[in-house]
Design a protein with these regions (language model features):
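A structural motif corresponding to the C-terminal lobe/cap of the Radical SAM core domain
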Residues: 1-166
Length: 167
């Protein structure tokens, strides 16, 4: 019903935060599910959104403490396949302030890197050491996911799955 109202009011884009397959679902009805079940539920919902909203960018945070191994990256690739019209946006875990409770925890764990604030860009670099990855392994997985997401095949599928407007 909310989507119908948004469509009637001319909403052209939505940028929902999926964030993670394992945590940060408390903003939606997915707080009690994770992994494959969350992938399936969210994929179905985002595909349905395209009946009302022409552009949906889905946002993910990579490198959260709940992420370990290849699974979070592989689930995200499967999301790209299951919801080809969605434009995925990837952010790397970064702390932009010093007083947030989570940042204080990272500081206690000596995981915050000394990085000038003016150079922070959570799309290219992060200032929090990943809990469950070595740097090279983490960035190899990020590069692999990005290459998959923006491959010719994926971009073609995204283009073909998107309703095109003449305006």
């Amino acid at each position: 019903e909310h989507l119908k109202v948004m469509q009637q009011n001319g909403v052209e884009a939505m940028l929902p935060g999926i964030e993670s397959w394992y945590e940060l679902g408390n903003k939606s009805k997915t707080s009690h599910i994770a992994g494959e079940e969350k992938l399936n539920r969210i994929s179905e919902h985002v595909n349905m959104m395209f009946n009302y909203i022409p552009y949906v960018q889905t946002n993910f945070v990579l490198g959260l403490d709940s992420d370990a191994g290849s699974e979070p990256f592989e689930l995200t690739k499967r999301f790209v396949d299951k919801v080809p019209a969605a434009f995925p946006g990837y952010s790397l875990l970064s702390a932009f302030g010093e007083a947030a409770p989570l940042n204080l925890q990272y500081q206690r764990e000596n995981r915050v890197l000394a990085f000038p604030f003016s150079f922070l860009n959570n799309h290219l670099a992060m200032n929090i050491k990943p809990k469950n990855y070595e740097w090279l392994d983490f960035y190899d997985k990020v590069i692999d996911l990005t290459s998959y997401t923006f491959s010719k095949r994926a971009m073609y599928r995204r283009f073909m799955a998107t309703k095109h407007s003449s305006t």
